Amino acid sequence: VRIFLRACFLFALLLTGESSCPAAEAALRTEALLLILGDQHSAYDQVAPLVAEVDRLKAANPGVPFAVLIDGDSFEYGNVVARRSEAVIDLALFAALAKRAPTILNLGNHEPDFYDPAAAVAKLRAVGVVVISGNARDRNTGQPLAPASTLLRLGAHTATVVGVMTDQLSTFRLAVRPGLDLANPVVWAKENFPALLKDTGLPIVLSHAGIRADREMLPLVPAGTLFAGAHDHVRFTHRFETGVRYFHSGSWMEFYSLAKLRRDPGGSFYWEVEQVPLDAQAPGDPALTALVGRVRAEHLTPKDTAVVGRLPRALPVAEAARFAAAAVARAAGADTAFIGNTTFGGGLPAGNVTQIEFDACVRFDGPIFTATVRGARLRELVAAANLGPEAPFERRRGEFSFAAGQLENFADEKTYRIATTDWGAKNTARYFGEPALAWQEHPTVKLKAAVRAAWSEARP
């Protein structure tokens, strides 16, 4: 239908120079634009280009209502510049966004990386950001960390934006866990979505609960809902028969999602979602470009900027992650190695790679664990690994593993040795299913050392 309407509109223009197909003209018109992203993790190379992109989008769409929605995990404790500066760049980014458009942030598990949760919310509000979070309370006061929802004016239309976050305390900074009271997101949604999303013409959900929880929440939302997910560091879009548009925007601000509000021939609203790459090398906002350079100069040490390797070409994060998994397999004497995708942040640049760039790619360190598994089960584990943006929604269960080493030709009854990180071993059911595997810590192999050793032997 939409292709026909577009053809009708263009044909009318060719014949008369003006539209004689009002339904087609209405269907082509963008009623509002939303720039949506999550899991930013203090990706400072992308900060200035993001604000420049907002300026470009607004200039290219004059008069079109525009807003920015951020779906949690904007901060990154592992970024030494962010930690030492107490996120001054992140807060400047939010101030710049809020100055340009209404900006709403749904809390994730990394917002308390530098401050206690209440202080983090106050810092965000102070720079003009509207903060929401439905299922999180301050255990000391019993009060919500933020309202569950907010209204967003989009020209003549009003959207209701509802926020929900993960209840996995282990993903929060250790120091803030005792003060958090987190309701199960699915239970909370069942109790609160009906009232919050009732009688709203434009329902929007920002979920930082992950795909596993989202799968149970998606049937609870009205037809036509725009449902943004985050937490799993994945990127895809999916449209349900009900018109619900579900998507994740990736991580490290490598992409953003652009949601366009349109009308169908009957006058009902629907959303189109386009995922757009954000080029870190593109010209950025001058003020933020200068700020990033200045703050880095103030807080980086010679150890941070030491060169730890060199690459003939840039490596996207998936390629860098598979190289790391292959390094672990070799170091641990395993047939196949699996590393959870959220272990990795951004990719690696061409040329000299510094310690801080390496740490931004391989976010965590720790011991490697090994286990044995039969070939039939290993075949299933490999099939669930290395998911890209084109993987069908039916295969998505949340976080996944990057796998390397032997990836095929498994004999069903043969026993194979596999390796993973300490995080994978501790969360074996999540990554490797049931029955739980019996993991043993390798006596010497550590993740980052294994990757650096492989790097020095053969450039990836």
Predicted regions and their residues:
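Positively charged n-region of N-terminal signal peptides that target proteins for export
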Residues: 1-6
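Surface loops and adjacent helix of pleckstrin homology
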Residues: 17, 164, 383
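Intrinsic low-complexity/disordered segments
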Residues: 15, 19-22, 228
